[in-house]
From Swiss-Prot:
Its EC number is 1.2.4.2. The keyword Oxidoreductase applies. Belongs to the alpha-ketoglutarate dehydrogenase family. It catalyses: N(6)-[(R)-lipoyl]-L-lysyl-[protein] + 2-oxoglutarate + H(+) = N(6)-[(R)-S(8)-succinyldihydrolipoyl]-L-lysyl-[protein] + CO2. The lineage of its organism: Bacteria, Bacillati, Bacillota, Bacilli, Bacillales. It holds the Pfam family OxoGdeHyase_C. The gene is odhA. It comes from Bacillus cereus (strain 03BB102). Keywords: Glycolysis, Oxidoreductase, Thiamine pyrophosphate. This is 2-oxoglutarate dehydrogenase E1 component. One of its GO terms (cellular component) is oxoglutarate dehydrogenase complex.
């Protein structure tokens, strides 16, 4: 028998979904139709049925008495509770968020659920029973449903149910369900919004009529993108944000430049007209780029606040700008002027990424970049994403470009709140923008706005979109612009009259005409055809003394081999580190990893911050670096580079996610925005770097020539043929050499630890100067501890980087030398090892070997001076481990021909052309390598052909 207790009522604490659960359990308890939670069963026995008697005030202000005691009421309450949650979760399916489509037709699951309850049923249930935080004026469940439908099924639609954090989810629902998000705008702000839309539309239409047929990738159809960006930037500035970084593609970019970044109309028109105008500051390099790829930096302000806005330069490779801009933001957030890890303040900057509706689900770089958003090494405290959704990608409809309902669905997997908004409802768009910036500033996480509009013209202004989308373009042709729609709304609301609206339009037109009149005639001279590389770039990097005093190196080494008392270093690692103890003494030898650590420490002591990331970079792919130690008992980490004395710069080394493209883009962006920092990206194996090829092609190699965007990024690409197959042999140096021109970067393949030490220090010395450029290093694997790559302390304390090195003990009898062998990296060490082994007899008096340490720019003067010593030279040979169609041969061949002149032959020794970089059989590899070495050292071989083994030929 039920024991009722009338003194305490625990059921009053339950509301909404929790109430629904209790009612459902009580129904099972009464009917015996299923198992009941034991704790609830005990409460039912003590307190009886959930009693929520209340006076319900209906719409006609009459009070009715409601009690859920009977089973029928229990079922109705449960259905209402479920309906409330369904509206919150699936209201977006009924929302009118696409201006080119009618509102949902009522056939959805949600609509059917609504039809299961009559208005009378809903009027009988108190609002508080199903919505604990029901605002004032909401009395019944019918009021609740009407209110929630108004919130969730109009021109704003929300997807929050996938958010895992209950606090965030509750905050989001509270924000949209309360009146705080959709407070009526003041007449002043509504008028300003109309003026902004008039400027955007007027600018685009002026371009359309004035520069007929010229590509501009119009914003029309998603015009509200500009006011949305305005709102986010302004609200960010009010929150004290110092830098707002924007990444976007070409669609709408010119309007964003002109309005959000305040680029003068006259400067925009001059670019279309190909005219020179006074005051225009070139934000491009010596080759330049099309106008809708260029970026801009501008301090944007109003009467109260200001902030710096940076629109990143961007290629047409969609979405690849995303990680670059994230790198900008992290660099702006970090203080790198103290030892240890940099200090990050995510309130100093944030990112806005404008995506395309086809590119967001289509480009893998998007998900790679989203994956960075919560990682310690890459998070920037939240990015605001805006999909400029015009429902078509060039000529491809959405049903052919994605497998999901919405273009934004990818974001759900990363726990990102999503708001869909009709781009024809300006005030709803601003509400979405406000929610986005508030969420980002409060929770420090990403937020996405799906701005759904259309594309008024074709992909570019020369396309006829009706060819491929005839029906929708019939609609678009007759569809009013968002400016016209909003103007009518303001006129109907009495905010402005027709004359005032016309005055706004005329003012915009007069401003455009006036600015166009300032543009001089087109510059038809051909002077710009002759591109001139800046002298400081053309001269290359000057020779720099990069030695460090021996006492300083010894002190550094002592610090590198120290760790806090009680810190338990893994025994195997401890043994590796202890081997380095005497490396700088008289008979000591310095291996590659120690040379790197010594270089890092000395660079830090000179005030240059360092950031190194890559897969497994803390330990090193080949268990060589050990720059971060792990306590075997606590798993705490410690880096000696954080505790060395006399350091006034930060050091960070991070293991990256299993991504190349996003991480390379991020590190490039970080370095561009923090030019004083030595930023390094390390591939796990150089073979895998080609998944970031678009970043190498579009940014790292060409960014300065196109945009004047300087970078000193270092790429560490493990390279070397050791019989490990086609995925663990080649960093594809041929590709970096193919991109090499105009001294755009340095490409090197080194043969000693000292050379690595000096080139790192040289790179650090040019950071933040006009001489800066990226450094591409083919780094060793098997050579990391090879005896012939070890260096002495004096080789670090004295001298500088040498672009070319002569093999010791060769060429001592210049008149006898007939063959000059040029090689690089591991191939050069293999030749040296064969000579040192003494296994075979060679006439070494007739041969000399030069190691080309710096492949680009090629050290021509140095090599020429060597050649001049050998009066009887007959042949210059390039020897490489890669197949002939790969490696450096096709880059080196014309250089060799020029060096040799008319009397000296040139030749190649190496593997023949192959489609795969390496074979998979280690025994075959070894046999081939031995043949290459023996043929290179055997002067008598004299260029015989042996196609089955290796390829040897001359000119």
């Amino acid at each position: 028998m039920t024991r009722k207790n009338t003194t305490t009522n625990p059921w009053a604490k339950f509301h909404g979904p929790n109430l629904g659960y209790v009612i459902e359990q009580y129904d099972l308890y009464v009917t015996g139709a299923g198992s009941v939670d034991p704790e609830l069963q005990e409460l039912f026995e003590i307190f009886g049925a959930p009693s929520f008697q209340d006076d319900v005030v209906t719409g006609d202000n009459t009070a009715t008495h409601f009690s859920p005691q009977n089973t029928g009421n229990i079922e109705k309450i449960l259905k209402v509770v479920q309906l409330v949650e369904q509206i919150r979760s699936f209201g977006h399916t009924l929302a009118h968020i696409n201006p080119m489509e009618d509102a949902a037709n009522g056939q959805s699951l949600l609509e059917r659920a609504m039809n299961e309850l009559s208005d009378a049923d809903l009027k009988a249930i108190p609002a508080k029973t199903v919505w604990q935080d029901a605002p004032e004026g909401i009395h019944t469940a019918l009021d609740v449903i009407h209110r929630l439908k108004e919130v969730y099924t109009q021109s704003l639609a929300y997807e929050f149910s996938h958010i895992q954090d209950s606090e965030e989810r509750a905050w989001l629902h509270q924000m949209v369900e309360s009146n705080s998000l959709r407070q009526p705008l003041s007449n002043q702000k509504r008028t300003a919004l109309l003026k902004r839309l008039t400027a955007v539309e007027g600018f685009e239409q002026f371009l359309h009529k004035t520069f007929v047929g010229q590509k501009r990738f119009s914003i029309e159809g998603v015009d509200m993108l500009v006011p949305v960006l305005d709102e986010i930037v302004l609200e960010g500035a009010k929150n004290g944000v110092e830098d707002v970084m924007i990444g976007m593609a070409h669609r709408g970019r010119l309007s964003v430049l002109a309005h959000v970044l305040e680029k003068p109309y006259s400067h925009m028109f001059a670019e279309f007209k190909h005219a020179k105008i006074e005051g225009a500051v070139a934000n491009s390099g010596w080759t330049g780029d099309v106008k809708y790829h260029l970026g801009r930096e501008q301090v944007v302000s109003n009467e109260e606040v200001s902030t710096r806005v940076t629109l990143a330069n961007n290629p047409s490779h969609l979405e690849f700008v995303n990680p670059v801009v994230e790198g900008f933001a992290r660099a702006a957030q970090e203080n790198r002027k103290k030892s240890g890890l940099p200090e990050q303040d995510t309130s100093k900057s944030f990112v806005i990424l404008v995506h395309g509706d086809a590119a967001f689900p289509g480009q893998g770089i998007v998900s790679e970049t989203l994956n960075l958003s919560r990682l310690n090494a890459y998070q920037t405290g939240g990015t605001i994403h805006v999909i400029a959704n015009n429902a078509v990608g060039f000529t491809t409809d959405s049903y052919d470009s994605r497998s999901t309902k919405y273009s934004s669905d990818l974001a759900k997997g990363f726990d990102i709140p999503i708001v869909h908004v009709n781009a024809d409802d300006p005030e709803a768009c601003l509400a979405a923008a406000n929610l986005a910036i508030q969420y980002r500033m409060l929770f420090k996480k990403d937020f996405l706005i799906d701005l759904i509009g259309y594309r008024r013209y074709g992909h570019n202004e020369m396309d006829d979109p009706a060819v491929t989308q005839p029906q929708v373009y019939k609609k678009i042709k007759n569809h009013p612009t968002v400016r016209a729609i909003y103007a009518d709304q303001l006129q109907a609301a009495g905010v402005l009259n027709a004359d005032e609206i016309e005055t706004i339009t005329q003012f915009t037109q007069e401003q455009l005409k006036s600015d166009y009149a300032q543009v001089p005639p087109a510059d038809t001279s051909d002077a710009t055809i002759h591109v001139k590389v800046p002298d400081v770039v053309a001269k290359g990097i000057q020779s720099i003394d990069t030695g460090v005093e021996l006492d300083s190196l010894r002190a550094i080494n002592e610090g590198l081999l120290s760790w806090p008392e009680g810190f338990n270093v893994y025994p195997k690692v401890k043994k590796i580190l202890e081997r380095r103890k005497d490396a700088l003494e008289e008979n000591g030898k310095i291996e590659w990893a120690l040379a790197e650590s010594l270089a890092f420490a000395s660079i830090l002591q000179e005030g240059t911050p360092i950031r190194l990331t890559g897969q497994d970079s803390q330990r090193g792919t080949f268990a060589h670096r050990h720059i971060v130690l792990h306590d075997t008992d606590t798993n705490e980490t410690y880096s000696p580079l954080h505790r060395l004395p006399n350091i006034n710069a930060s050091f960070s080394v991070h293991n990256s996610p299993l991504s190349e493209a996003a991480v390379v883009g991020y590190e490039y962006g970080y370095n561009v925005f923090a030019p004083e920092t030595l930023v390094m990206w390390e591939a796990q194996y150089g073979d895998f770097s080609n998944t970031a090829q678009a970043l190498f092609d579009q940014y790292v190699s060409a960014g300065r020539a196109k945009w004047g965007q300087k970078s000193g990024l270092v790429l560490l690409l493990p390279h070397g043929y050791e019989g490990q197959g086609p995925e663990h042999s080649s960093a594809r140096p041929e590709r970096f050499l193919q991109l090499a021109a105009e001294n755009n970067w340095t490409v090197a393949n080194l043969t000693s630890a000292a050379q690595y030490f000096h080139i790192l220090r040289r790179q650090a010395s040019i950071l933040g100067t006009e001489a800066v450029r990226p450094l591409v290093l083919m780094t060793p694997k098997s050579l990391l501890r090879h005896p012939l790559t070890l260096s002495t302390a004096s080789q670090l304390s004295e001298g500088r980087f040498q672009p070319a090195l002569e093999q010791e003990n060769l060429g001592t009898k210049p008149n006898k030398v007939k063959r000059l062998v040029l090689s690089t990296g591991k191939m050069a060490i293999d030749l040296a090892a064969e000579i040192e082994s003494g296994k075979h007899e060679y006439n070494l008096d007739e041969i000399h070997i030069v190691r080309i340490e710096q492949l680009y720019p090629f050290p021509a003067e140095k090599v020429q001076s060597i050649i001049k010593r050998f009066k009887n030279l007959e042949e210059i040979i390039w020897v490489q481990e890669e197949p002939r169609n790969m490696g450096a041969w096709h880059y080196m061949a014309p250089i060799l021909f020029e060096l040799a002149g008319d009397k000296v032959k040139t030749g190649y020794i190496g593997r023949p052309d192959r489609s795969s970089p390496s074979g998979g059989d280690p025994f075959a590899h070894k046999a081939e390598q031995e043949l290459i070495v023996s043929h290179a050292l055997d002067v008598k071989y004299n260029f015989r052909q042996d196609k089955l083994e290796i390829e040897v030929f001359s000119n």
